[in-house]
Structure formats: structure tokens, C-alpha cells
């Protein structure tokens, strides 16, 4: 039933009342007219000042003038502006952003610092879970190149400060690890060292021996009495283990020779 049909019904009722000479409105006709008017106001669009259900915009699209619409427009303008900027403008923008970030990080509290690191770690974890093998390799290559460039530019004071921080962080990590984690770390380091030694050139091997000797001399000069005692105990245990393995290897070789001679019938005295 359209709005026009409803109005026609009302007009027909009024004409019937006039033709019957009924000047006063009956309660029944008044109730019928009120019902029809309510129907028109409720179900027909544009019949009242209240918005109709079909006139309400969809919530999936940002409304004009809303915060979501404003942020979407700003992001679009920012993408267009960055696409048109030159390399110098890009470097300037990144430098300003880095300076602002350093300033903001220097003013944050210890709790805010920990929360920021936690958010960054969680975001990196989610990103690395979704990346492919090629993306992971490209990320590692870029990170290694970025680190090499940074190390080439840093001063002696910055380098010393970085080494001290790395050493302190490593000491804390070693103190917090469990015996199982320590054993796994040593095994991984030993395997990585063996792989590196296999692929190194003679010059790299000589440089490695010199570095190891210099590092050992420096360590022996600065070690405490407790460290010296622990080192001697470890050296003695390692020597015993190597001696046992060597004897076991010789025994296995002798057993293999005897077994082969018995199978061939060439063992003397038989």
C-alpha cells in the first residue's frame, strides 16, 4: 500500500461523512484515521522528520566528516606526497622522524620503554611468522648490509660503547639461561665454528689463529683466581675426554683390523 492509496482512503472516508450529513467526527472514524496516519509515518519513507531505516548509511563505509574518513583522506594525501618527493626530501623527512623518535624515546620512563620494546618484539614476531623463505633471506641480507654500513660509520667511542653494551647483555643472558639452553648454545656455536673453518681460506685461517691467540692472552692476563681454577678444571676434563675418545678410536680401528683378518683368514697364528 502506497502513501497515495492511504491518502485516498482517508479522503473517501471524509467524503462519506459529508454525504451522510455527519458534521461531527465519530470516535470510530477518528481511530481509523489515527491508525492510517501512524502507518504512513512508520512505514513510508519521507513521511516524517525522523530518518528512515533505508536512509541510514552503511557502517562498513566511513561517513563523511567522521574520524575514519578524515584519517583515510590524510593517509591517501600522505602517500601521494611521498610518491612525488625527491631523494633529498626523503632523507630530510627520515632524519627529522629519527630525531623526533630519539627525543621521544629519551623522555620516556622505564615502564614506557619496556612496553615499547614489548610491542616491537610482538610486531616483529607476527611479521616474521607470515613472511616466506625468500622474504626472510632478503630481510637477513638487508639487515647484515645495514649493520656493515653502520659499523663503518661509527666512531671509536661509539664502537667501544656498543661492545660494552653487547658484553653486558651477553653476561645477563648467560646468567639467566638453563643448563639445557647452555648445552644447546655451545653445540650450535661449535657447529657454526666447524662450518666456518671448513670454508675459510688459508689467510682467513691464519688470521683466526692470531685472533684466538691474542684473545686467549688477554683473557689470561685479566682472569681472577676463581676463573683460573675453573679453567684448569675444564681443561683437565677436556683432556681426559679427548684421551678417552682417542683410545676408543684406536680400539675401534684395531677391532676392525682383527675382524677383517678373521673374515679373510689371514690372521697370523690361525
From Swiss-Prot:
<protein>
    <recommendedName>
        <fullName>Uncharacterized protein C05D11.13</fullName>
    </recommendedName>
</protein>
<feature type="compositionally biased region" description="Polar residues">
    <location>
        <begin position="260"/>
        <end position="270"/>
    </location>
</feature>
<feature type="compositionally biased region" description="Basic and acidic residues">
    <location>
        <begin position="182"/>
        <end position="215"/>
    </location>
</feature>
<feature type="compositionally biased region" description="Basic and acidic residues">
    <location>
        <begin position="113"/>
        <end position="131"/>
    </location>
</feature>
<feature type="compositionally biased region" description="Basic and acidic residues">
    <location>
        <begin position="83"/>
        <end position="100"/>
    </location>
</feature>
<feature type="region of interest" description="Disordered">
    <location>
        <begin position="1"/>
        <end position="270"/>
    </location>
</feature>
<feature type="compositionally biased region" description="Polar residues">
    <location>
        <begin position="21"/>
        <end position="40"/>
    </location>
</feature>
<feature type="compositionally biased region" description="Basic and acidic residues">
    <location>
        <begin position="154"/>
        <end position="169"/>
    </location>
</feature>
<feature type="compositionally biased region" description="Basic and acidic residues">
    <location>
        <begin position="225"/>
        <end position="238"/>
    </location>
</feature>
<feature type="compositionally biased region" description="Basic and acidic residues">
    <location>
        <begin position="64"/>
        <end position="74"/>
    </location>
</feature>
<feature type="compositionally biased region" description="Basic and acidic residues">
    <location>
        <begin position="1"/>
        <end position="10"/>
    </location>
</feature>
Amino acid at each position: 500500500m502506497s502513501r497515495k492509496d492511504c491518502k485516498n482512503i482517508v479522503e473517501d472516508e471524509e467524503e462519506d461523512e459529508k454525504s451522510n450529513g455527519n458534521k461531527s467526527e465519530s470516535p470510530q472514524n477518528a481511530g481509523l484515521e489515527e491508525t492510517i496516519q501512524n502507518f504512513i509515518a512508520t512505514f513510508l519513507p519521507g513521511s516524517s522528520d525522523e530518518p528512515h531505516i533505508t536512509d541510514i548509511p552503511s557502517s562498513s563505509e566511513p561517513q563523511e566528516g567522521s574520524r575514519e574518513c578524515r584519517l583515510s583522506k590524510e593517509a591517501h594525501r600522505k602517500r601521494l606526497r611521498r610518491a612525488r618527493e625527491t631523494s633529498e626530501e626523503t632523507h630530510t623527512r627520515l632524519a627529522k622522524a629519527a630525531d623526533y623518535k630519539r627525543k621521544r624515546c629519551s623522555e620516556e620512563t622505564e615502564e614506557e620503554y619496556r612496553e615499547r620494546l614489548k610491542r616491537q618484539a610482538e610486531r616483529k614476531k607476527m611479521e616474521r611468522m607470515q613472511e616466506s623463505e625468500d622474504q626472510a633471506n632478503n630481510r637477513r641480507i638487508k639487515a647484515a648490509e645495514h649493520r656493515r654500513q653502520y659499523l663503518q660509520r661509527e666512531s671509536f667511542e661509539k664502537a667501544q660503547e656498543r661492545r660494552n653494551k653487547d658484553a653486558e647483555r651477553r653476561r645477563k643472558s648467560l646468567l639467566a639461561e638453563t643448563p639445557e639452553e647452555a648445552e644447546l648454545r655451545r653445540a650450535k656455536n661449535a657447529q657454526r665454528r666447524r662450518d666456518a673453518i671448513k670454508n675459510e681460506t688459508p689467510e682467513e685461517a691464519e688470521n683466526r689463529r692470531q685472533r684466538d691467540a691474542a684473545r686467549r692472552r688477554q683473557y689470561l692476563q685479566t682472569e681472577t683466581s676463581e676463573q683460573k681454577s675453573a679453567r684448569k678444571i675444564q681443561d683437565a676434563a677436556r683432556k681426559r675426554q679427548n684421551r678417552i675418545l682417542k683410545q676408543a678410536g684406536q680400539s675401534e680401528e684395531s677391532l676392525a683390523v682383527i675382524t677383517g683378518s678373521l673374515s679373510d683368514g689371514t690372521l697370523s697364528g690361525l
